[in-house]
Amino acid sequence: MMPMILTVFLSNNEQILTEVPITPETTCRDVVEFCKEPGEGGCHLAEVWRGSERPIPYDHMMYEHLQKWGPRREEVKFFLRHEDSPTESSEQGARQTQEQRTQRSVVNVPGEKRTENGVGNPRVELTLSELQDMAARQQQQIENQQQMLVAKEQRLHFLKQQERRQQQSVSENEKLQKLKERVEAQENKLKKIRAMRGQVDYSKIMNGNLSAEIERFSAMFQEKKQEVQTAILRVDQLSQQLEDLKKGKLNGFQSYNGRLTGPAAVELKRLYQELQIRNQLNQEQNSKLQQQKELLNKRNMEVAMMDKRISELRERLYGKKIQLNRVNGTSSPQSPLSTSGRVAAVGPYIQVPSTGGFPLPGDPVKPQSLTIASSAAHGRSKSANDGNWPPLKQNSASVKSTQMTGDWKDSGMEGTLKQGAISSQPLPLSALGATEKLGIEIGKGPPPIPGVGKPLPPSYGTYPSSGPLGPGSTSSLERRKEGSLPRPGAGPPSRQKPAPLPPASNAPQPGSSQQIQQRISVPPSPTYPPAGPPAFPTGDGKPELPLTVAIRPFLADKGSRPQSPRKGPQTVNSSSIYSMYLQQATPPKNYQPPAHGTLNKSVKAVYGKPVLPSGSASPSPLPFLHGSLGTGTAQPQPPSDSAEKEPEQEGPSVPGEGSTVESLPRPLSPTKLTPIVHSPLRYQSDADLEALRRKLANAPRPLKKRSSITEPEGPGGPNIQKLLYQRFNTLAGGMEGTPFYQPSPSQDFVGTLADMDNGNTNANGNLDEPFPPRPTAPLPEELAPSSDANDNELPSPEPEELICPQTTHQTAEPTEDNNNNVAPVPSTEQIPSPVAEAPSEEDQVPPAPLSPVIHPPAASASKRTNLKKPNSERTGHGLRVRFNPLALLLDASLEGEFDLVQRIIYEVEDPSKPNDEGITPLHNAVCAGHHHIVKFLLDFGVNVNAADSDGWTPLHCAASCNSVHLCKQLVESGAAIFASTISDIETAADKCEEMEEGYIQCSQFLYGVQEKLGVMNKGTVYALWDYEAQNSDELSFHEGDAITILRRKDENETEWWWARLGDREGYVPKNLLGLYPRIKPRQRTLA
């Protein structure tokens, strides 16, 4: 119980006070003793309340007294009065008075004195003894009081110490209490902080996951954005082409079946639908185009008239030279033409290349034999020579010698088309139309609608004779010429040995002129004349002819067709553009290789040029291919010139030569060769092959990526048989334009198709027909689509048909891809050699380097006709080349040709089959980063865990590219996350490239999957392979089984996890497990 503190004022002024601790035992006397001075007596304690004062008796208990006041205690003040209390002093006075009275009688006090109490009785007198006694008593009292004072002081000191102790204990208790409260508060705060920290950590983890997801999505969005942009560009281009077709500017370019495919993602489906609708509309325009073709035929007649006038002018200017040309052209094909190489043999003519190059006459001479027909046939070349035409570049002047044989069917038309179209600028619509009309009128085939594959003439076989074509055809040739005229770059055809021409009068024979035109088209690309005077100087209004090029009969069967000058670069579906080398078919045993590589120019590669409408053949990108056109020596053309002029060079092919090679669209990138029109040139000599090899030696090769199957090159240069990078444009959606002009169809329609295929196989124009035409087994008609996308194009057969060689002739139209290109036979550099045809002995023998003029092999000393005999074994399809679908799939997946992948995959027996290095199409698509192809292959059910020779799976490839998106796609398709390589035993997560962009995300994802496998999804994983238990503590399982992981590792095993399958438990190897089950191969149908 806490003692109460009583404040006592020692004086009236209330300035001097003391505090007295009050306990229940404290009396008023104790308070007075505590407060009065030592030795002081007669003091009492008085309480004052509201001005009234009352003395407190000594025996009064102060504690109880204070409690009685209760709340009013603060109003009461206690004073120490230094006098006795009135009650006690009255009692003492009474006693003293009695004593004084008694003393008065005894002692007489001299003066008035007061007693100590102040009750003096002056009359009392004390004796000495009394005084002494009093003094003694007082002394004793003083001593007693002093003793009491000392005792009180001691007690007071003790009480103060006790009070201090109590206060200290109280303060300490209070402090302890406060500390306890503070500790509790801090503990509560700590708990809250810990809870908040847990929330913060969780939010950090969530934020990290979200940021990773956001990064992945942003990467996906960027990819999709790029895909959409590319799709938009493609759609714009296609829509522009469609608009041009509607306006009539582009003849014969239109995708067939409305299928324009490309590396499109799901977002592009809508765009594809729109394109399909437009293609359908284009098909509906076929009838209109046919009418337009009739008009074009009329215009061709006008062109023929113009050609006549031009020929008359030329006769005046070069009368003697023209006569010589006529004589040479008709007399012997071998004699070099002193005059311009314009002379084309109308009849099938097999030309034996002369050893020497023919010098070009100073002025290009236009052979009279060509007359209007030849001029029409060379519409472009002739015009180039004409004063009206802008001078050709010398290089471009060279004309590809073409077969004079009756195979003009394609070559003539195609040549003219190519000449016109190949020009760097697309031919004017009228020009295209003219050629197209010619093709229609001559070929009798229904005019193809631009954009719609045009049916080839019923028989595209060799054009048997130079028999005059209908005047319409001549005019169409002239029209082509007119079309070509606009192209300033067109060079006069290089001098060719005149093929034996049927006597040609100045008056053009419509048929012959067309044939000549077809055969003699001036390749726009300059070719260096092998030997002899330079090509016509551009300085002349008329470009001089390039050095004479021996005109070899172009074998229609497989020989590549020279591109008609009219043809501009063909447009190929962007998706179908992939680099391909031209593979030459083996020449027939009988075949006499033409001495001159003039035809070689027919195949051209086009690089970097924008894809032109199918109506125009794309210039060949490879300059080196063009050189052969001259005197058979391969001489590189400048790519630019070649691109523009190659068509013309090809164009000059002799009408007899039935196959012209269209220039292919140039490849997407200089490092990738665009598909070369595959024209296995028939009857190709070893010398021609050697020249081609030399040209290809410096040619850009497709980049060797992991998937490419490349044949080793021998010392002689690339193995042309194996380089045959078959144009698969048709399958890939690429367009090969058919020649505008088709000579009247002959019985051998298949042969013409083959020629077209061969000649036009160079859809990309990679080879300028560097290879002399080699005899090749005719490709199946389907395989050999008419190369020209123009009148001669046929609707494309189904992809299966395209790929499979057919033994029976089909008047069947060669397959055309959506762009009206006939589907070329798919081939890739990966294919060692055409499956269907074994290389002939000549091909197998390393060809000797070509001299400027190649002498025909002795064996082929006798002239051979290019015309195919109806019953010839070569006529059958059995020997046609068929390309390995797997090689095509491997290359298409590497190059990003989504359309080709979609089409060819059904031809592949096992899309997961690897090449000799263990590379599968999925490896290629992953390494090249083609997400849409990867997704397609995975959805198709290819083996996502196929490993190459070093154990690299597609997941390793994706990780090495730091592609999180592909890694996620592969993991979700059943990729084995713990699969390791053989050489360095590293998983995909170890293959992430630390110095490359995207390393952190890719590494985090793969390591995260490794850590979460067997933990997330309640420990459920999926077996990716079948496994039979080898020990009693192991589990057997089958692919696709859902296994629950109970323990990822223990003291005994780290690579084996303890798992449960059904009611069994045991060890399972972790590298056979995946986070997702593998996608099952889907049913193989073409649906």
Swiss-Prot record:
List, alphabetically, the GO terms of the cellular component aspect.
Answer: cytosol; nucleoplasm; nucleus; plasma membrane
Q: Where is the composition biased (Polar residues)?
A: 87-106, 393-405, 506-520, 570-589, 805-831
Q: List the disulfide bonds.
A: none
- Protein family: Belongs to the ASPP family.
Q: Where is this region: Disordered?
A: 82-122, 374-415, 442-721, 734-878
* Domain SH3 span(s) in chain numbering: 1016-1078
Domain notes for this protein: The ankyrin repeats and the SH3 domain are required for a specific interactions with TP53.
Q: How does it assemble?
A: Interacts with P53/TP53; the interaction promotes pro-apoptotic activity.
List, in alphabetical order, the Gene Ontology terms for molecular function in this entry: p53 binding
The name this protein carries in UniProt is: Apoptosis-stimulating of p53 protein 1
Please give the residue positions where the record annotates the modification Asymmetric dimethylarginine.
Answer: 552
Tell me which species this is from: Mus musculus
InterPro entries in the cross-refs: Ankyrin_rpt, Ankyrin_rpt-contain_sf, ASPP1/2, ASPP1_RA, ASPP2-like_RA, SH3-like_dom_sf, SH3_domain, Ubiquitin-like_domsf
Main location (coarse class): cytoplasm
Q: Which Pfam families match?
A: Ank_2, ASPP2-like_RA, SH3_1
Gene encoding this polypeptide? Answer: Ppp1r13b
Q: What else is known?
A: In contrast to its official gene name, it is not a regulatory subunit of protein phosphatase 1. This name was given due to its similarity with a protein that binds to protein phosphatase 1.
Enumerate composition-biased segments (Pro residues): 445-458, 523-536
In the record for this protein, the ANK repeats are positioned at 917-949, 950-982
**Residues bearing Phosphoserine?**
332, 335, 679, 708
